């Protein structure tokens, strides 16, 4: 049994193979967003480059007080408006209910350098390995003017705690990453945490229900996001 997560490096990414295999299934991309009018348009434009890749593009607008929904609609997404602030996990669940595709990709709306390869990279393990149920992105996170240093909560808290629960989970480089892909059947087989704890809960639930070997992680390069004040979270 494969008891550690699968890892897809940048060198192993094969866009042509992904586009070919994708024709055999359907894909929804879901972007939970709250007050991300300044970044959501660029995110949607970047991921919409490859014709025929995405069958459903949905932005779940979590009670934004800015023009997030308007901008998302202008950039081609179907907008699902939540009536009140619900939390990231609840927004992800709303996106799940609003779509019907077999494969799902969840992306953060505040990333300022989302690339055209995010979506195909995230689904490659799902297309190539039937045993993979959930995929997480990993990346370098510059901090201020330093090339690395971001993601300290991952290194100091999340990974050590996960290692205590399931040793193989400590191999996940970015357990708190919002860039996630999986199979509809997998998401429907578990109970989604409603808050920001959804990222950790997904890993634990998948490892428990399937195995650590049902997880994969893919290299997304360098990630930069808009830092928000605490009251916006």
Question: Could you say what each language-model-derived stretch is?
Answer:
Residues 1-45:
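N-proximal low-complexity "stem/linker" segments adjacent to membrane-targeting elements
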Residues 45-54:
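Short, acidic, metal-binding catalytic loop of nucleotide-sugar glycosyltransferases
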Residues 55, 69-98:
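Conserved donor nucleotide-binding strand/loop of the catalytic core
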Residues 61-69:
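A conserved acidic beta->alpha catalytic loop
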Residues 92-94, 116-186:
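Acceptor/aglycone-binding surface of glycosyltransferases and processive sugar-polymer synthases
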Residues 104:
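Short aromatic/hydrophobic "clamp" motif used to bind/position activated sugar donors
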Residues 194, 204-221:
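Catalytic donor-sugar/metal-binding loop of nucleotide-sugar-dependent glycosyltransferases
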Residues 216-233:
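Active-site donor/metal-binding and catalytic loop motifs
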